[in-house]
Structure formats: structure tokens, C-alpha cells
Swiss-Prot record:
Stated family: Belongs to the eIF-3 subunit M family.
Organism (species): Yarrowia lipolytica (strain CLIB 122 / E 150) (Yeast)
A biological process from GO: formation of cytoplasmic translation initiation complex
Pfam family, one: PCI
Protein name: Eukaryotic translation initiation factor 3 subunit M
Residue span, PCI domain: 180-354
Phylogenetic placement of the source organism: Eukaryota, Fungi, Dikarya, Ascomycota, Saccharomycotina
Gene Ontology MF term list: translation initiation factor activity
A Gene Ontology term for the protein's cellular component: eukaryotic 48S preinitiation complex
Subcellular location per the Swiss-Prot or TrEMBL entry: Cytoplasm
Keywords for this protein: Cytoplasm, Initiation factor, Protein biosynthesis
Subunit annotation: Component of the eukaryotic translation initiation factor 3 (eIF-3) complex.
HAMAP family recorded: eIF3m
Function, as annotated: Component of the eukaryotic translation initiation factor 3 (eIF-3) complex, which is involved in protein synthesis of a specialized repertoire of mRNAs and, together with other initiation factors, stimulates binding of mRNA and methionyl-tRNAi to the 40S ribosome. The eIF-3 complex specifically targets and initiates translation of a subset of mRNAs involved in cell proliferation.
Amino acid sequence: MSDINFMVVDGSLADLVAELTAYIETLGCDELEANCQRALAAGEEPKVFELITQQLPLLNKSSEQQFESVWQLCLHVFSFSESFEWVDAVLKAISGHSNLPRSFNGPAAAGQAVVAVLASLFNMLSSSHDDAQLANTLLAALTTAEETGNLHLLAGQLKSDQTVTWINTWQIEADVRDQLIAKIYSALVQLDEPAKALALLVAAVGNTQTSTFPMTCKLVQQALKSDHVYDFGSILALEPVEDLKTTEQRLFELLTTVASGEVAKMQSLAAGDAKSLIEENDFDAESLLAKTRVIALANLAAESPEIEYSIIAKNLDVSLDTVELWVIDTIRAGLVEGRLSQTKQSFAVHRAQKSGPIAKADWEVISQKLDVWKKSINDVLHVVKQARENANAQKRKIAA
């Protein structure tokens, strides 16, 4: 689950139990070692694991130097168990702010050690195929890391595609899945990975097993707020988002208005019908309008190889002296490439990415371009075929 290394302990179960229980007794438990050895002698291994499980909270009294190694030893002892009933007891004993070991120099150091132990537990459980325990362990690690300022320890895993795979494939309760998605999303935002966070929501909403109405609304809200999202195509293509047309009409209308770059409509919504929606969702009306203008400019550039400043100003409803700034913003958003000419008062378009839903007219334009491309290819093939036939005829003539 993380890049943290963990100690591998070797030896027979009897030796490992003797070492672990002897240490636990020093923390305040009498006769644990003797009771466990008697159970082992009687062939009652489950009894041994039960006895150790009952004393797990004592391990949090370990010194900073011994805490992680003794927990790793404990996990190794449990690896001899045929069941995984002990997992919940481990999570209960080590998780939560109140269970942080007090021997460490502050919560950050203690949290780092706890996350390391939970990472080892997660790796152990990866072969058990118990999705619920894996999810609960990951939740515990995320909670501890967040509370103690150690999210960076899990950054590598959280940023990987494997995290999305877990969420989409684990057979777990819906409320647990929602908690997990919320925790991972929050962690990615705190790790300054807004694009990854949004991709997580897109994947979750796009999966019928994980999609929920609140999550769909959150996806739309975060996409509209994001400084990095200008192409809403993948979001609008999701069926749960399309369903908002009937279940959350105002939010859906706001989404499609911004995504299509409809500046006049956005101005109208911000001043009227959607004013309360914008306030309720903590949207910034000016930011939404700015995003709409950037998308509008990209769509305008996709329709013409060169655009006069006056046309840009009219379509974006901005002053002529700010046109170049809007073009620069659109270039920075990755939607267009081109060259500004102050002399000609125009923008020469080299590349433009049209945003928003694909309308019937867009498909017709695409179809026309494909027809032209197809005709050009056929013309080239005809020329090549004719040249080949002429070459073969010339060879036959020479041979004769």
C-alpha cells in the first residue's frame, strides 16, 4: 500500500509467541506467556491468537524504538492463523487518535509508525481476498495519516490507478465505499492533486456499482470549481450526470451552460435563476463566468482559422483592451494555440479544441471533413495505382 518497508521475522510459531508474549508481560500482563505455551502444547492454536488479541492495546505502550518492530512481530504471529478474525481487533487497538502511542515525540512521529504498521497489515491481507478488511485497513491508514499530517506516506499509492481499481472492484458495503472515496478524494486534494481527485470521482460515478446521486452532484460541483477542468465531455457522457437533467435540473443547466461556453446565458443565470444555486454550492460566480468565456473562445477558434479582436470581444462580452488577456488564458488552459497580432488586431489559430456537448451540427461537420479526407485518400490511391500500372507496362515493353 505504501513505500514503507517492514521487518520480516522468522522462526517457529512457538518461538515467536514466546518472544511476543514475554514482551507484552513487561507492559502489564501477567502469565500471558505461560497460558499461550500451554495452549500451544494442547494443540489449541486459535486459543493462542485469542489470548494475544485480548492484550493488543498494551502494545501502544511500547517505546518509540520498539513500537513498530513489536507490532510487526505481532502481525507475523497472526499470519500463522487460519482465519482473519484478529484483524478487527488489530484495527481497533491501533486506529484512532486516542490510541496513538504516547512514547513518541509528537503525533506526527507516532502517526508515521502507525501508518507503517497498517501498511504492513494491508499487504498481509492482499492475499486474503477479504475486501471489507482491506477497505477498513485502508480507511484506518488514511484517517491516521490525515490526522497526523502524514498523507505524504501514502501519496505514491493514492496517485496510482490501482486505487481506482480497488474502489471499483472491492465487494464492500455502499457506506464503506462512500467513506473510502470521500477519504481518498480529500487526501488527493490535500496532496495538491486536483486532477487525480476529479478522475477518482469520474471513475466512481461512471461505475454503476459505486455511483450515487450525492457523488454525482459532487463530481459536477468539483468540476465546475476546478481551475483545471475545461473539457467536460467525459463528465457529460456519464449516464448519472445525464440523469441530473431530471433530478437536479438547475445544477445540470449550470453545467451545460459553462461546458458549452454560453456566455450570455451564464450571465443571466448568475444574475437570476441560478443565483441561489451558486450561493448554496459555494460557487464563485466570477470564476464560473471566466471559465465560460475561456470555453467560448476555444469554441470560436475551432470554427475559424483567424478571429478579429472585435469578434472575440463581442462573443465574450468583454472590452476590446482585454481580448489578448483572454486569449492568453485560453492558451494556458490548453484549449488553443496560435499567434496574436496587435497590428492586424486578430488571433491566428493554429490549433483549437472545441468543448461542450457534441451537437448534431458538429457531427455533420465531422462527417463532411471525413468525406473530404476519404476523397483525398482515394485520389492518392488512384494516382499510386496508375503509376504502378505504368511502371509495369514500361517493364514489359523493355523486356519485349
